[in-house]
Amino acid sequence: MKYNLPCVNIILRQLTLYPSILGVYNNKQIYRYCMTNKLFVTKRNGSKELIDLEKIHKVIAWAAQDLDNVSVSQVELKSHIQFYDGIKTSDIHETIIKAAADLISEETPDYQYLSARLAIFHLRKKAYGQFEPPKLYPHVVKLVEAGKYDQHLLLDYTADEFEQLESFMDHGRDLNFSYAAVKQLEGKYLVQNRVTGEIYESAQFLYILVAACLFAKYPKETRLDYVKGFYNAISTFKISLPTPIMAGVRTPTRQFSSCVLIECGDSLDSINATSSSIVKYVSQRAGIGINAGRIRALGSTIRNGEAFHTGCIPFYKHFQTAVKSCSQGGVRGGAATLFYPLWHLEVESLLVLKNNRGVEENRVRHLDYGVQFNKLMYQRLIKGQSITLFSPSDVPGLYDAFFEDQEKFEALYVQYEADDSIRKKCIKAIELFTLFAQERASTGRIYLQNVDHCNTHSPFDPTVAPIRQSNLCLEIALPTKPMEDVNDPNGEIALCTLSAFNLGAIKNLDEFDGLADLAVRALDSLLDYQDYPVPAAHTATMGRRTLGIGVINYAYYLAKNGVYYSNGSANNLTHRTFEAIQYYLLKASNQLAIERGACPKFNETRLSQGILPIDTYKKEIDNVTAEPLHLDWESLRASIKKHGVRNSTVSALMPSETSSQISNATNGIEPPRGLISIKASKDGVLKQVVPEYEKLKDNYELLWNIPSNEGYLQLVGIMQKFIDQTISANTNYDPSRFEGGKVPIKQVLKDILTAYKLGIKTMYYHNTRDGADDSLIEAEEDCAGGACKI
């Protein structure tokens, strides 16, 4: 028998490092490895040659440089057992990458970088035919000619400027990605042919060209400095960008606002305009919030009694069909959250639309729902009273007052309750709240919006620009107006453009000064750079110029600072951090207003009256943190009153399940479920290790180790003191902590009341622990999750 020498070396290295596995491999397996001289490999051009194990060894050894507790030979052995005669070179790469990724564990977390480097090597070979990336200018010329990049790049920048841009780039930063990040880049963000799988670029081209596109219209004397600064911020993960921007900026597609909020009126024309707008935006990567609260109830009269109204459910089904008609630009599946008030006459039928009981005719399961509450609803619950349900069409002025003026709403509500001529239904508040809590618990995706908090603690003046809905993921709160047709210039579709600061990459709070300036400038430029498929969206965006900048990696930030979600130790740090974030974002927008002018509808904001978030927050927060303000808010107030702000809103705290993987960060403000999460997506099963695992593993507070929602809700309330829009805040329940293994509805209601007391505007998922291994499959909801996730 003739043995292949490299193969014998592999086995010897393997046995030297791991002598205990000697008995695992029998003679037949060793023979299979050692006869690899009979294995041929099929090259990319179709020719065949003998497999070169030494070449493979060199690549894996390169990828393992400077990493701890990784074994080159273990990756080799795990790979080679899967080789076969005629295997393609690309399949060899995939096999080795998967072999390394399978070894990621709590004991050996650095395999996430070894597998990532191998994946980068493979990605570049696929894109360029070699590991070394091409020069920037010829690369851009080639892809513009192929129709993959937007031609404006060559019109806006000269060849000399491209040389300067190239000098800013550091392709070595590709090697800082984790495995989960590379797979997300391949699957979602890099420009590619989604039919053939052909990839045209690597990550640093993405980053430099996004920066170049966003600052293209800046003065030539300064724009390259901004491009360099923004490139460095995004390529070193200090600023995180959402899926639509990462996947779309630099391509001919020009719609990047993550969230779209569409309000529907109570007419067929408005319903059809809403549906048309949904289709246009879902096809361009956006997640949708639909306000359908105005639609009259089942049995209402139409055309002076000529017919009975069919009620809400047929129209909700119509919206569901529109949402699911397109995948989001080949990157995400369409998704929407639909909003209605708790006091709607059909509410008992609407609350159950998502559950698995009932029949197709009385269920609309593929939308999520946001139920709208206010102080009066909570008071009726606390006092043991009833809630009266109305059709909005029967109670003039009530629907608008629900958002604009709480005193007026209560007066009208009581007046209509006493009017026997109006159709209504009374239900005990506890029964209605219990039904809401049960459906929220059983589906996890019946959300909550406190519309009074959204309007009293808001940058907008509710008398002229009320907040009447939120978005898909419940972090956006912007004014909307119904359209009567899809080209109605008087309608208002709210768009919000997102990004986030990576708290884990921040050394001190002063850094937010420069980062906020870059983020606000880049996103503000995006508003002018993108297209608007519907006039109502262009009208609203140009008038208000709304941004939503949030955070990722909060759990790592707490772990790094030795504080926890559950015991109040993070409260003061959180207050200082979010004060700095909001202050520097407002300062940046104010500076931009000085340079370019305030947004045209600045007069519809409370900011124009000199009112800041620090003036309108819920004072209950002072009972959970006594941290004082540290920054010069009074000077900022004076400058905003004098010069305005460029952007009506600047902040929102969104989920970041996907883009946080690019930065190897924890998701948004959420605690991790495990130190290693195994996340399923259409790009495969990805292992992600929390940042600085070895050093901080004992500092992380895992989701299901947190005893209750109290501490988390306090932190969300502190954040909401400063954040001008709202927060995707979740509640989490472990049934094993409760008697009989069942979460009491009383506890769910208590948390809802606590959230209201703390001034929390919206509540997103209700998560229930299901007994599965928490580090294992954490289903990634991007396909159904919509683009307001970043």
Regions found by a protein language model. Give the residues of each.
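Polar, glycine-rich mid-to-C-terminal structural blocks
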Residues: 352, 371-435
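Short hydrophobic targeting helices and cationic amphipathic motifs
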Residues: 5, 12, 19-22
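Internal maturation/activation junctions in enzymes
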Residues: 516-538, 542, 564-656, 728
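Terminal amphipathic helices with adjacent charged low-complexity linkers/tails
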Residues: 112-137, 456, 460-467, 758-774
